[in-house]
Amino acid sequence: MSLSRQDIQRLLEEYQLLNDLLASLQAQHATVSELVEELSTALDGVRLLKSEGGERLVHIGAGIFVGGVFEGREVLTPLGAGYYAFLDLENAERIVKERLEEYSKVKTSLEENIEKLTERALQIRQVLERLGLR
């Protein structure tokens, strides 16, 4: 394999750029994964509130639960951009479900991009290793 000095320099630059981009995408993926998990928990909570009767244990954070009978049929729901509104359980469920679907798509897209960039970085690394540069 005969590569010019410029070709090698471009490969090194692309390899570094890919690694930087991968680090950024992996951080985004971690954030989106947390949001998906949080939305799944919220959706389960709204569905639990929709079911009738009895005392409930509700997670309030840090592994702490509070018990009680919940008679309210509305929940304070984030609408985006820092705005909240009291919504009936049906609409709250719909909004949380839509957000969960959106973030799940973003997560899948990030995973696909990470996979493609990882493959390209591996190809470049193999070329650089054959040239004795990595």
From Swiss-Prot:
GO molecular function: unfolded protein binding
GO biological process, one term: protein folding
Transcription is among the record's keywords: no
Pfam families: Prefoldin
InterPro entries (UniProt xref): PFD_alpha_archaea (IPR011599), Prefoldin (IPR009053), Prefoldin_subunit_alpha (IPR004127)
Keywords for this protein: Chaperone, Cytoplasm
Chain segments annotated as transmembrane: none
Subcellular location: Cytoplasm
GO cellular component: cytoplasm; prefoldin complex
Job of this protein: Molecular chaperone capable of stabilizing a range of proteins. Seems to fulfill an ATP-independent, HSP70-like function in archaeal de novo protein folding.
Protein family (similarity comment): Belongs to the prefoldin subunit alpha family.
Quaternary data: Heterohexamer of two alpha and four beta subunits.
Protein name: Prefoldin subunit alpha
Source taxonomy: Archaea, Thermoproteota, Thermoprotei, Thermoproteales, Thermoproteaceae
